[in-house]
Amino acid sequence: MAKIHFRTAQFLISAPSIRQCPTEEGTEVAFAGRSNAGKSSAINTLTGNGKLARTSKTPGRTQLINFFNFPAAPDQRIVDLPGYGYAKVPMAVKKKWQADLSEYLQQRDALRGLVIVMDIRHPLQDFDTMMINWAVEGEMPVHLLLTKADKLKPGAAKSTLLAVQKHMRDAQVDDLVSAQMFSALKKQGINQLEDVLNGWLLPQHDEPEAAQE
């Protein structure tokens, strides 16, 4: 089975809105999350490039949709969506982000899956749940990345993961929503995340005859 070499990721373009996004050839997966959840660190750990997704000491500052692709797979993309939900961001900006995120999720045909990044110590905040609901309503697969797992003892981290998975089962969305623990500091969970992303980005490679129809 073909696999993407995520460590070859390169910056493609920044877009201030969905209208400035690249053309929709190929497939893409998006990363979304609260501004202090560790989204940029997760992308940088996945790609082995500490400077690929910019981190800011002022959470919520980045308002661009950032696209990355791969030299050997230019039509497959990782998308870094603006962080959301930070208390110091003006309400007008929050509302614009909410509208932009909703528009992207609902109208972007190339999108194959959504990674929602959550601090394992504070999972399933209100806007996280809203993002899950948006995706599920559109039958979009979701992967919950519980970051900063190193901040909890192993038993507590595992209990949180199990609680999140149970919440998805109780909500009857576990067929679309998966979850895992992740630590950028300890490099934990990279292979599992890669498997999820490859499954989303390269499904057509598994069924070449169907893709030609």
From Swiss-Prot:
Binding-site positions, Mg(2+): S40, T62
Domain (EngB-type G) ranges: 25-203
TM region positions: none
GO cellular component, one term: cytosol
InterPro entries noted in UniProt: G_ENGB_dom, GTP-bd, GTP-bd_ribosome_bio_YsxC, P-loop_NTPase
Its job: Necessary for normal cell division and for the maintenance of normal septation.
Sequence similarity: Belongs to the TRAFAC class TrmE-Era-EngA-EngB-Septin-like GTPase superfamily. EngB GTPase family.
Alphabetic keyword roster: Cell cycle, Cell division, GTP-binding, Magnesium, Metal-binding, Nucleotide-binding, Septation
One GO-annotated biological process of the protein: division septum assembly
Gene: engB
GO MF terms held by the record: GTP binding; metal ion binding
Protein name, as recorded: Probable GTP-binding protein EngB
